[in-house]
């Protein structure tokens, strides 16, 4: 297959899936891993894809994309993460569910539970959770965003009145030094309130968050008890070895 045709196919496959690993591209195009890596490097230099650890993503996945787009990106990985989180939450527990498509996936995975008490600033998650009549769902007040997130000073004040068992926290980016980053200062204030009001904080993040850049600092990975993700750079693995934060991969392994 000519290189130009192969590049077109790679771009199309990545756009359709949001993210594909090197191994998946090798299988789809029937070429060597070395060839795929060279192709990905060329396409990344042209800004036609976004190079990631072990694969490639659509360029738009590196930005704070629209809600519908973000929900589609890495949906399989988000669902796998959500299933692992759900295993840790017992029936009758109390928890916060944060803004974001991965916390929303967790909400969906919890529908088989009973008698959960949930506080959320995620309108989409609340809409899902109301299907279970045994749940006690409380919505935080504040300013409603177009993506269904609720933020603002009123949201922070409301969340700070609670002390719950778990906080399901999303994040926009995780820096190489373990810093937790987001795009919106007001959203970060809400996330801080969730961490402070939770006995255990469960951070949920697909692997693309390790290559994204955001400017507002929330804190450190060491501020949360668990990190649930699909894949993680070796530098973060080494960082977590010095912390109490447990790393849970979407395949269920704990490191």
Curated annotation (Swiss-Prot):
Superkingdom of this protein's organism: Bacteria
InterPro entries for the chain: Carb_Metab_HTH_regulators (IPR050313), DeoR-like_C (IPR014036), DeoR_HTH (IPR001034), NagB/RpiA_transferase-like (IPR037171), Tscrpt_reg_HTH_DeoR_CS (IPR018356), WH-like_DNA-bd_sf (IPR036388), WH_DNA-bd_sf (IPR036390)
DNA-binding region as annotated in the record: 20-39
HTH deoR-type domain location: 3-58
Keyword presence, Transcription: yes
GO terms, biological process: glycerol metabolic process; regulation of DNA-templated transcription
Classification via SMART domains: DeoRC, HTH_DEOR
Keyword field: DNA-binding, Glycerol metabolism, Repressor, Transcription, Transcription regulation
Any one GO molecular-function label of the UniProt entry: cis-regulatory region sequence-specific DNA binding
Function of the protein: Repressor of the glycerol-3-phosphate regulon.
Protein name: Glycerol-3-phosphate regulon repressor
Organism placement in taxonomy: Bacteria, Pseudomonadati, Pseudomonadota, Gammaproteobacteria, Pasteurellales
Gene: glpR
């Amino acid at each position: 297959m000519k290189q130009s045709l192969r590049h077109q196919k790679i771009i199309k496959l990545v756009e359709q899936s949001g993210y594909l690993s090197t191994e998946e591209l090798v299988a789809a195009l029937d070429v060597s891993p070395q060839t795929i890596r060279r192709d990905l490097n060329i396409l990344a230099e042209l800004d036609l894809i976004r190079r990631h650890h072990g694969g490639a993503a659509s360029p738009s996945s590196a930005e704070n994309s629209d809600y519908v787009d973000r929900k589609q990106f890495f949906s399989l990985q988000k669902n796998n993460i959500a299933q692992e989180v759900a295993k840790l939450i017992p029936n009758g527990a109390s928890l916060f569910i944060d803004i974001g498509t991965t916390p929303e996936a967790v909400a969906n995975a919890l529908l088989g539970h009973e008698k959960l008490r949930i506080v959320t600033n995620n309108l989409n998650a609340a809409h899902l959770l109301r299907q279970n009549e045994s749940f006690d769902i409380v919505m935080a007040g504040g300013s409603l965003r177009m993506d269904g997130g609720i933020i603002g000073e009123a949201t922070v004040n409301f969340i700070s009145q609670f002390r719950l068992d778990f906080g399901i926290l999303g994040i926009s980016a995780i820096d190489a030094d373990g810093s937790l980053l987001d795009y919106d200062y007001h959203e970060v204030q809400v996330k801080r309130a969730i961490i402070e009001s939770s006995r255990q904080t469960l951070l949920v993040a697909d692997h693309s968050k390790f290559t994204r850049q955001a400017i507002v600092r929330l804190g450190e990975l060491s501020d949360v008890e668990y990190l649930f993700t699909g894949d993680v750079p070796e530098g973060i693995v080494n960082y977590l070895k010095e912390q109490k934060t447990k790393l849970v991969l979407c395949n269920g392994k704990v490191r």
